[in-house]
Amino acid sequence: KYTDVQMLLQEPQLGTGHAVQIFQKKNKLDNNSKLIVLYGDNPLIDLHDLKNMNAQLAKKDIVIMGFKPKINTGYGIVVENKGKVSRIVEFKDASAILKKIKTCNSGIMAFSSKALKLITQIKNNNAKKEFYLTDIVKLSKKYNHKIKLINAKDVKTALGINDMYELGVAETIMQNQLRKKAMKGGVQMIAPETVFLSKDTTFGKNVKIEPYVVIASKVKIGNDVVIHSFSHIEGAVIKNKVSIGPYARIRPGTVLENNSKIGNFVETKNSIINKNSKINHLSYVGDTTIEEDVNVGAGTITCNYDGVKKNKTLIKKGSFIGSNSSLVAPVIVGKNSIIGAGSVITKDVPDNTLALTRAKQKKVKLNKKKK
């Protein structure tokens, strides 16, 4: 799937410099090569900063991305002498005086081909016996390499993640960014802080989202869509003038065509709900195609799994499914047909047909109980 990505295993893990050394052994770099080193625990990095670093490599040999947090919680310290970077000191190794320096090392660095040749000279002369990539700064001074320090556009973009709390902080920042982008693009959110989006979520015009909605990955939303409270959507295509929820679960493979409606406590999966069709209440629809102008009554279930495989249901145009019905797949309901309430349908229903499997109603007179 990611054919342009090369995966290398660092085993054992002997530091950031060691990781780059492994990369160098597997890849031949020419004199025009550039390398930007990023970290998996810096998810908020901004493309603007990376472009800036790349541009600086036209004049510099090493570019360091720094940032200035209000409180240094353990980041390496960038030491400068007369406006030039002289070294980077790990927080735990820094003196009390150095810890007063405001500029921290994000860990993100960019290298010219000239600087990359020094990677092999990094030693592990430290208490942890690790190869620190930051040691290349001190090495470069010996060769008069040009070093540039740039500060991140936003301090938040340089945040690293070391535990679940910091992951939660980063997720909050990311969600706020996604909400802002969506609302600036015209999406109305009643209580933005309760709406959760994915980075790949796309919106059309005039979309309204009520409180407590989760939109997971691979969701495309069209124009004039209303998503009511407590709905969860994942892997779905939502066309125009669609209403969802409240309390709806839209699972992967769902396509909601124009002017369709999914009501409260309805779950759909791998199904196409066509134009003007409605599933208003308390239903499960899986592996199903519902054609245009279909009404699915409350409590309808498509019984798609027989214990071995999933089977498909087709409900054709203009049909009406009565409440509390079970459609046992594979099954087809023909055009303009009616399924009587409370039916269990196990065989195909022809066009223009009423089908019902209700047991005959009996009346039994009750004897009065003695007091």
Give the predicted meaning of each segment:
Residues 85-175, 180:
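Catalytic-core segments of class I nucleotidyltransferases/pyrophosphorylases
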